[in-house]
């Protein structure tokens, strides 16, 4: 999926010198582009109307589903996964809000609980908070929504369940 357009312009104004990117990959919060003539470009994403700060934070948490979590070779095209974390849940909430698939009150209630997770995890967990977060689980059965919205709701649900499970003492 294209999320941005980037062009540095001609290498020389008056002479044809070919160049361009061999490859561009996202890894741990940065976009790495290997340009044929100029070398390596490293770009950071910034929030905009199309991409929230929460989505950027969640993207930085992605890890390979196969093998070591920090080993990454884009040529292997290993599928990526995300941990069940408040950052990931907030990213799904931002996407659902942007698409008007959930109401702001529900989003605020979930975020209020997510704000407590880190502290409670550092203290060894909290069964009560786990139950409260688990109550937000949603069913997409019979929901009149497109495939992408249903997928985001299912992933938010799975993420909230994972957070809830990690909070249990």
Residues covered by each model-derived region:
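Feature marking well-ordered beta-strand scaffolds used for ligand recognition
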Residues: 1-96
């Amino acid at each position: 999926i294209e999320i941005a357009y980037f062009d540095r312009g001609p290498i020389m104004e008056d002479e044809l010198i070919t160049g361009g990117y061999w490859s561009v990959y996202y890894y741990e919060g940065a976009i790495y582009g290997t340009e044929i003539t100029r070398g390596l470009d490293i770009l950071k994403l910034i929030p905009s109307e199309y991409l929230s700060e929460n989505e950027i934070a969640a993207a930085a948490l992605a890890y390979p589903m196969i093998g070591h979590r920090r080993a990454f070779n884009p040529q292997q095209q290993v599928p990526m996964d995300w941990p069940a974390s408040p950052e990931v849940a907030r990213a799904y909430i931002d996407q659902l809000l942007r698409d008007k698939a959930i109401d702001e009150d529900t989003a605020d209630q979930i975020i209020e609980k997510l704000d407590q997770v880190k502290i409670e995890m550092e203290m060894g967990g909290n069964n009560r908070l786990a139950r409260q977060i688990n109550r937000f689980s949603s069913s997409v059965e019979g929901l009149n929504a497109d495939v992408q919205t249903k997928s985001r709701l299912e992933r938010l649900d799975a993420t909230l369940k994972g957070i809830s499970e990690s909070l249990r003492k």
